[in-house]
From Swiss-Prot:
Coiled coil: none annotated. The lineage of its organism: Bacteria, Pseudomonadati, Pseudomonadota, Gammaproteobacteria, Enterobacterales. GO terms for molecular function: adenyl-nucleotide exchange factor activity; protein homodimerization activity; protein-folding chaperone binding; unfolded protein binding. The gene is grpE. This is Protein GrpE. Participates actively in the response to hyperosmotic and heat shock by preventing the aggregation of stress-denatured proteins, in association with DnaK and GrpE. It is the nucleotide exchange factor for DnaK and may function as a thermosensor. Unfolded proteins bind initially to DnaJ; upon interaction with the DnaJ-bound protein, DnaK hydrolyzes its bound ATP, resulting in the formation of a stable complex. GrpE releases ADP from DnaK; ATP binding to DnaK triggers the release of the substrate protein, thus completing the reaction cycle. Belongs to the GrpE family. One of its GO terms (cellular component) is cytosol.
Amino acid sequence: MSSKEQKTPEGQAPEEIIMDQHEEIEAVEPEASAEQVDPRDEKIANLEAQLAEAQTRERDGILRVKAEMENLRRRTELDIEKAHKFALEKFINELLPVIDSLDRALEVADKANPDMSAMVEGIELTLKSMLDVVRKFGVEVIAETNVPLDPNVHQAIAMVESDDVAPGNVLGIMQKGYTLNGRTIRAAMVTVAKAKD
């Protein structure tokens, strides 16, 4: 028998045994490399996770700051709007006694006397022009009667029995009230109707 013809006890040629062993080693190597994790890969994965977490925190922080800035901008706009709307409040409050004086002068003036007609007309025109000016700036007069009492714009001075006006409604105006852009700057002093006993 030659060396080529030599058979192993299992009946395989030596080349076949080497090939089989080589295939077994190749089959084992991928499993071994899958089980072995490179520490650099672990470190990279850990760093990537930390980076993602840091990016999320930064993104959240930026969004939070943007939201705070937007809220601050809105509040500032509202404050400026209110300042524009109600900047005249002090000035209007100083004018109200003048308007009241003109109203009282008209109430007590003797309109039947022809000698007083020019003065009454002058007071009426002065009052009208003053009210027109303050209306341009958002001031409205509260002087309606026979309307339900509204504690936001009326201050009840007295209750008076009445057949003509429903109970709880404004019967008379003692002093006119005023609003500035919808906000009451002086409530109207009124008498309120009540049912007769």
